[in-house]
Amino acid sequence: MTHPPPFIAVIPARLASTRLPNKPLADLGGKPMVVRVAERAREAGAQQVLVASDAQSVLDAARDHGFEAVLTRADHPSGTDRLAEVAAAFGWRDDTVVVNVQGDEPLIDPVLVRDVASHLAAHPACAIATAAHPIHDAADVFNPNVVKVALDAQSVALYFSRAPIPWSRDAYQPHWPDVAAMPPPAFPVYRHIGLYAYRARFLRTYPSLAQAPIEQAEQLEQLRALWHGERIAVLITESAPEAGIDTPADLARVQALFQPGSK
């Protein structure tokens, strides 16, 4: 078995969620959600797992289950900003691989976490690695809530967008506006998976990077890195990961999976 390169997993966990308050502490089979996520990160082989939160109750929950936790500011606009604070505080070496494991994804595949970390380690010219999978439903291609990524020949990101990219002129133009009901074009359209591995060097510089106009227009923070000349390596997987928890309905669905006897 090939061992993955060393990496650190940081789980940003914000208590004040608009759609689902106290989400990190939601009970999943007798453990808080944030602990379930931390367990997945540990299964992925992270040499260090850190829960980063602005809420003492979240830190206490993590520590009660044996995980390291660090208090961060409450005014971070994104999880990446929270990671940047942690990277600055711990003083990790520039080439340290740090994976942002979302605190609301208790079903995330540990293999995917490990593979994204390994993908960044294998691409020294890139500051970030992430993942994507082929889209097989044209409705998803045209859904602005499904973020797409266009790649170069080395599977490095050219652009991320809520729009359908790449645009297949010959496939779509004659059939507009009924294209969302069509099969997707023969060439792959990739859906971005919101899992990131960063070099610590990039995280420390991130807060000083000005917001990009394309970032503000698309409301996609990864575009800030591209705007400022950083490279993002993209790992291609065959299928979508399990969805995260954003709503009470999502929570009920996942809680059912953690009930005794559930498969």
UniProtKB/Swiss-Prot annotation:
Top EC group: transferase
Protein name: 3-deoxy-manno-octulosonate cytidylyltransferase
Keywords carried by this UniProt record: Cytoplasm, Lipopolysaccharide biosynthesis, Nucleotidyltransferase, Transferase
GO molecular function terms noted in the UniProt entry: 3-deoxy-manno-octulosonate cytidylyltransferase activity
GO CC term, one of those recorded: cytosol
Keyword Transmembrane in record: no
Pathway the protein takes part in: Nucleotide-sugar biosynthesis; CMP-3-deoxy-D-manno-octulosonate biosynthesis; CMP-3-deoxy-D-manno-octulosonate from 3-deoxy-D-manno-octulosonate and CTP: step 1/1; Bacterial outer membrane biogenesis; lipopolysaccharide biosynthesis
Function: Activates KDO (a required 8-carbon sugar) for incorporation into bacterial lipopolysaccharide in Gram-negative bacteria.
Protein localization: Cytoplasm
Similarity annotation: Belongs to the KdsB family.
Taxonomic superkingdom: Bacteria
Keyword Transferase among record annotations: yes
Listed EC numbers: 2.7.7.38
Lineage, broadest ranks: Bacteria, Pseudomonadati, Pseudomonadota, Betaproteobacteria, Burkholderiales
The species this protein was found in: Burkholderia orbicola (strain MC0-3)
Chemical reaction(s) catalysed: 3-deoxy-alpha-D-manno-oct-2-ulosonate + CTP = CMP-3-deoxy-beta-D-manno-octulosonate + diphosphate
A GO BP annotation: lipopolysaccharide biosynthetic process
